[in-house]
Design a protein with these regions (language model features):
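Nucleotidyltransferase catalytic core that binds NTPs
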Residues: 1-163
Length: 163
């Protein structure tokens, strides 16, 4: 499969992720490749409060036609990438450009604007119930469901640390 792809935790997906996925789609269109997003299976702690299903649902709302794959304990990013053509391209944030050197693909690094949204900021806004900040960072409403999942994961992480 000849693709332009990106990989991330997307926990939660935010406007910076959306911008990166738009770059994946645009680059894929120009290069006549398939745009793909691979969602990490990381889940169940303060940094990873949303499940693959939660993250995929949000990404598919933004980009209904997008191919979204996910890693798992038995299916690593490297294993998924074995199905990609050697001329495939990976799009990553500039801060992650060296993190994927184990993959044999050309990488296209995107500069991160100063004041760019971050999942850490979005999770903090959710924890504080700050719906306006959350929406400014993510582009979607902070639902009770998302807020509860983020709060619950943070509480579980705190309990693990204190024992």
């Amino acid at each position: 499969m000849d693709v332009v792809f990106t990989y991330g935790r997307f926990n939660p997906p935010h406007l910076g992720h959306k911008m990166m996925i738009e770059e994946v789609i645009n680059k894929a269109s120009k290069m006549n490749k398939i745009p793909v997003v691979i969602v990490s299976h990381s889940y169940g702690n303060k940094s990873n409060p949303l499940s693959v299903e939660d993250k995929t649902r949000i990404l598919k709302r933004w980009f209904p036609q997008l191919t979204v794959l996910s890693s798992s304990k038995n299916l690593s990013l490297a294993k998924i990438a074995e199905n990609f053509d050697e001329k495939s391209v990976m799009v990553v944030g500039e801060n992650r450009k060296n993190a994927f050197s184990f993959l044999p693909f050309n990488r296209h690094a995107l500069k991160r604007p100063n004041a760019a949204p971050s999942a850490t900021k979005a999770r903090a806004a959710a924890m504080n119930g700050n719906k306006e900040v959350f929406k400014n960072l993510t582009g979607y409403n902070l639902t009770n469901n998302i807020q509860n999942k983020i709060s619950k994961a943070s509480t579980i992480t705190k309990k693990k640390r204190s024992t």
